[in-house]
């Protein structure tokens, strides 16, 4: 009545209404921020959260089978660590995935060439990169279409800012060098019982309160934000800061590289040197120079690995996060 929506009169009608709208499959564990954020957002919007049959491990056939069977229209993954096996699963089986409308990657970088590969299988799907943190929540997002996929660049939005190195001011578009990626607006109160850490992470600059999770970035003159990586995993080599994620993306651009983690190790000449820990695609056997030549197409030569270590498996957390302590140990022992 009063022009409102029709109320379900039968159980079948109620079930049909309840299963409409957002049907999300968050494939990472719910202990991961991206996993439980998407689950809560879906529930709070009246959608359905779908869980694969084997949530204790990444099983590509299980995930794609669940997407097909449950008609999921939204899939959450965590960067290349999830994308690679899922793409392998797409190649090995034919499924009806026409109901899938969007794939969101959050928590780790998703390489441009892997986005393109997803789109070659499912050209109708919207590929979305999301960047956020426990401290800031969701912060940046980027949508890719076939032929124009990129990694690490995001459109600017009013709540996102780049702060100066010393956190004294906000930088204008087209600034020199790198600053700190920051966010304003509705923010957490801080860390419980840790006032000092709260002051560092939630600084007040010229009367505005920001959150600074630790990512280094640049705001280009065209209002595009370039994210270079976490300051905590940078490698200072020859006096220059090198971002591990940037080198990883460059090495993974080689078609024979299945996965890669980059770490530093002591060097008499450079202070520290970059080491790439690489897992190759099964059956591939490129030489080091081939990998370096491809990486040099994407980053400056001084950032190239001084050593490449090949391993059968890259150690990552259940949520796909790189284990940089493990990588540093592998680099030191090589």
In which residue ranges do the predicted regions lie?
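Conserved AMP-binding/adenylation subdomain of ANL enzymes
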Residues: 1-26, 31-74
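Short, well-ordered beta-strand segments
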Residues: 23-25, 181-182, 277
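Short hydrophobic "strand-cap" motifs at the C-terminus of beta-strands
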Residues: 27-28, 52, 78, 105-106, ...
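Short acidic/polar active-site loop segments enriched in Thr and Asp
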Residues: 48, 73, 101, 125, ...
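AMP-binding/adenylate-forming catalytic core of the ANL superfamily
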Residues: 65-68, 75, 84, 132, ...
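Conserved AMP-binding/adenylate-forming
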Residues: 68, 101-130, 134-225, 230-234, ...
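Hydrophobic/anchoring residues in structured secondary elements
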Residues: 102-105, 262, 309-310
